[in-house]
Amino acid sequence: MTLAAILAQAALFLWFFGCIRTYRIGKALLVEGMGVKSAEFVMLCLFTATAALSWLFPAWGCWPLLGVLIFWIVVQFFCHWYYTIFGATPQKLSGYNECFRNTVHIIPASDKKLIPDLYHILLHALILLNIALTAFRLA
């Protein structure tokens, strides 16, 4: 389980780093990086610091990591999935689709429902995986 947790944390770090530095697959845009002067960079630092704590101090270090991961998934839910499930105003939908218009989508963007792009779907899956593995380490 330790190896799985390390690999999941590394995968999440590398995947989320795309929010700092732009990732492309060929000419296709996966995510546009926002740089180090961004909320994304703060979140990456929080995740990295608490992940390190979880390995340096396993008896208590997993708790801050779990807190950061839960906070992160709640923020992501209200930025993406809340609008997918409950609907978005035309203005929100238009802004979201404009912001992510050039990114890779496995489900095409819609002008009726907010559909997260591939990057965010995988990001959310990795956060959830890390929550599960961290909770398992605490059990």
What do these predicted ranges mean?
Residues 80-101:
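Juxtamembrane non-transmembrane "cap" segments at the membrane-aqueous interface
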Residues 11-18, 46-50, 68-78, 126-133:
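Membrane-embedded alpha-helical transmembrane segments of multi-pass integral membrane proteins
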Residues 35-47, 76, 116-124:
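Alpha-helical transmembrane segments of polytopic membrane proteins
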Residues 99-126:
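Individual transmembrane alpha-helices with interfacial aromatic-anchor signatures
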Residues 2-8, 35, 61-65:
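Membrane-interfacial loop-to-transmembrane alpha-helix junctions, especially the N-terminal start
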Residues 119-139:
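Transmembrane alpha-helical segments in integral membrane proteins
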Residues 10-41, 72-79, 84:
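Hydrophobic transmembrane helix segments
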Residues 48-65:
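Juxtamembrane helix-break-helix junctions at the cytosolic face
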